[in-house]
């Protein structure tokens, strides 16, 4: 059965190649709008499931689709991608010297050509401790251009990694796709013969 990754993220694509399974990528079209009473875990899980389902529904033949989403939570507040330098600087000051949570959900859905017939989802929470940052470090990081498309304005796998003192949990989940959990979900479908292992 064909395997698809519902993502436009080059980071997720690179991570999925580490599992040594053939797959194709398609960009999902999902409105990322958090409900008024939706907590962070429910929100990121819903987005992962919607990404997988929207790509699955375009397919004419049976397939498995992986969807994933990541967000950053600090003291109950979801930190989005920076809208401006001021927004970025504010978030970096919040995270400076503090521990925040990175929530990543991965969902695998099975599509039979007409409807979703099975779905398995995992939510991974990782604690990330930041070093204390100076304004000069914050400004220099913004100038690299890296923060612009990142949740909370940093990427652990890039320049932003030098601010991370410690993590407790999954490094790969912080990057965008928890490899262990993704592998386990795919194995669940393999047990029923639903994954093409060419």
Curated annotation (Swiss-Prot):
Q: Which reaction does it catalyse?
A: dTTP + H2O = dTMP + diphosphate + H(+); UTP + H2O = UMP + diphosphate + H(+)
Q: What class of enzyme is it?
A: hydrolase
Q: Which InterPro entries match?
A: ITPase-like_fam, Maf-like
Identify the EC number(s). 3.6.1.9
Single GO biological process annotation from the record? nucleotide metabolic process
Q: Where in the cell is it found?
A: Cytoplasm
Q: Name one GO molecular function term.
A: dTTP diphosphatase activity
Q: What residues sit in the active site?
A: 69 (proton acceptor)
Cofactor or coenzyme needed: a divalent metal cation
What residues correspond to the site Important for substrate specificity?
11, 70, 157
State if Hydrolase is listed as a keyword.
yes
A single GO cellular-component term on record? cytoplasm
Segments passing through the bilayer: none
Recorded hits in NCBIfam families, A to Z, give:
maf
Q: Which family does it belong to?
A: Belongs to the Maf family. YhdE subfamily.
Q: What is this protein called?
A: dTTP/UTP pyrophosphatase
């Amino acid at each position: 059965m064909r395997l698809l990754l519902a993502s436009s993220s080059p980071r997720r694509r690179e991570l999925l190649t580490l599992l040594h399974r053939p797959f194709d990528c398609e960009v999902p079209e999902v409105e990322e709008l958090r409900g008024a009473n939706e907590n962070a875990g429910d929100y990121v899980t819903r987005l992962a499931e919607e990404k997988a389902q929207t790509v699955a529904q375009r397919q004419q033949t049976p397939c498995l689709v992986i969807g994933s989403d990541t967000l950053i939570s600090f003291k109950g507040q979801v930190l989005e991608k920076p809208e401006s330098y001021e927004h970025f600087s504010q978030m970096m000051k919040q995270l400076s010297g503090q521990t925040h949570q990175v929530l990543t959900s991965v969902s695998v859905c099975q599509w039979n050509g007409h409807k979703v017939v099975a779905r398995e989802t995992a939510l991974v929470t990782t604690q990330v401790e930041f070093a204390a940052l100076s304004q000069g470090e914050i400004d220099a990081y913004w100038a690299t251009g890296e923060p612009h498309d990142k949740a909370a304005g940093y990427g652990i796998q890039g320049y932003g990694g030098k601010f991370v003192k410690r993590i407790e949990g999954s490094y790969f989940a912080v990057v965008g796709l928890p490899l262990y959990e993704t592998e386990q979900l795919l194995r669940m479908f393999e047990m029923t013969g639903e994954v093409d292992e060419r």
